[in-house]
Amino acid sequence: MMNEPVAGKFLLEILTRGMYSNPMHVYREYIQNSSDSIDKAIEAGILQSADAEIHISIDEKGRSIIIRDNGLGIPLNITRIKLMNVGVSDKDGITERGFRGIGRLGGLAYAEKVQFVTSAIGDSTRTIMTCDCIRMQQLLQKSNNETSDIMETFKAISAFEEQPEDSNEHYFEVRLLGVPQESGLLDEDDVIRYLSETAPIDFDSQQFPQARKIRDHFSEKGFPITCYKILRGARKKPIYKLYSRSLSTGKQGRTKAKDYVRDVEFIYKEASDGKPLYIGWLA
C-alpha cells in the first residue's frame, strides 16, 4: 500500500505519444531545442551566427534520423542530470522557445531507440544517452509491475556511455533509430515540406526577390525575422520557405496557369498604448 502520492509511469506515455497528434511535431520540438542552443552559443561567444547550423539526415532504408546542431551542447558535469530530468527546464519561457523540459521525449514514441549525444566546449568527453523505446512499451503495459512511477520507468530504459571527444567540439545530436515507416517521419519530401512551412528558416532570395524588402521592413519596425540555417542530407542543402516569384492557379493540370508576385505591401497597427498590435505582409 502506498503511503505517499506517486507520479505514475503512465505519465511517460502521455509525454511521448500522447503529446503530439502529428508525428512531424517531433521535428519541430528538436529544432526548437537546437535553435535555443545555438542562441546560447552565440551569446557565449563560442559560435558566429554565420557558422550556426542545424543538420538533418534521414536514412529511409536504415530507418534512422539524425538531427544535429553546433550550439552550446551540455557540459559533462551536468549532462546526466539534465538529460534525466523530466518537466524541468532552465529556459526562461520568453526569449527561448521551449520551457517545459519535455520536448525531447517526443521521439520516444516513434523509434525503437533514441540517443542523445552531446559535448560542450572544453570537455574532452562526449556523453551518449540511449533510451530503449521497446523496453519502455513493455514497462508501460498495464500487466507489467516491474516499475510503478515515471522516474523509475525512465531510469529503467536509459543507459549512459562516455567516449573521447575533441575539446573544441560543441554540439547536441538526436538519433532516432528504428523509425517505423508508417510514421511518415522518413519521407524526406514530406519532412522538407513540413519544415518549409513551420521551421524558423529564411526565404530563398533567388526564388522570391521580395525577401529582402520584407526582412528590411520587419527590422526597421523592430521585429527582425529570426532565421536559422537548416541543412538536409549528405550534401547539406539548405531548406527554405516555399515562397517564390510565381505560383500556379487552377486545379486541373491542363488549365494550370502562372500568376506572379510583382510586389508586397505591409500591414502594421499599434494598440492605444502605442505598443505594436500586429505586423505582416501581403503579396
Predicted regions and their residues:
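P-loop NTPase nucleotide-binding/switch module
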Residues: 2-15, 19
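Glycine-rich phosphate-binding loop
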Residues: 92-111
